[in-house]
Amino acid sequence: NGLCAHNFYCYMNNQLLEYKKMIDLRDLFHGLQNQMLASLNVNREFIEHPGSKGDATEQHWIEFLRTYLPDRYKVDKAIVIDSTGNVSEQMDVVIYDAIYTPFIFKQDGFMYIPAESVYAVFEVKQDVKGYIEYAAQKVESVRTLKRTSIGMVASGKTAAARPLTKIIGGILTTTSSYSGNDTVKVQLRKLKGLQTLDLGCLCDTGSFYVDYNETEPEG
């Protein structure tokens, strides 16, 4: 069907000054979602080995995020490490700072990323069913790490240390085999403290974002 376009007209004294077609951004993003879903479904249907299927799905999410996030953010599969040597579980998707990330270790696809550089972490699964709590536990393994922040000198002036912000945690899946949203909401309500999930994308079903200042998870 292609993208829908809206016509834009501008008149003055019955004279047409400007005419152009405007792309419907909602249709554009819906097209990107369908493209993503088609690729994930190909992996799901035709890659039979569970480990290989998981690796392919994780890499597809990583490449998608690399394409559409600003250049200052990097995306990789990695283990997060803190200054005391403690490490997280291996995270399927880590979004981290591309500019201020010091070199720790990267070899043959294996990476350690310092906790101070991490903005968000995600667990990737084929189906959300049965994995909300599992994803929450992996997110917790990152949030429990020690993070430090120090001041810096810029233009001859000392700037105060930047406050540490919450590391976003979530889950990315191809589908949901639950009959509705209620089960996911119940599971999200049970998560407390460092295990809370902030958002999730269930590619063929929808997405959720949780504002913990509210009493009801939105989805």
Regions found by a protein language model. Give the residues of each.
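Aromatic (phenylalanine/tyrosine) cluster motif
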Residues: 8-11
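Intrinsically disordered, low-complexity Ser/Thr/Pro/Gly-rich regulatory segments
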Residues: 4-6, 16-90, 95-219
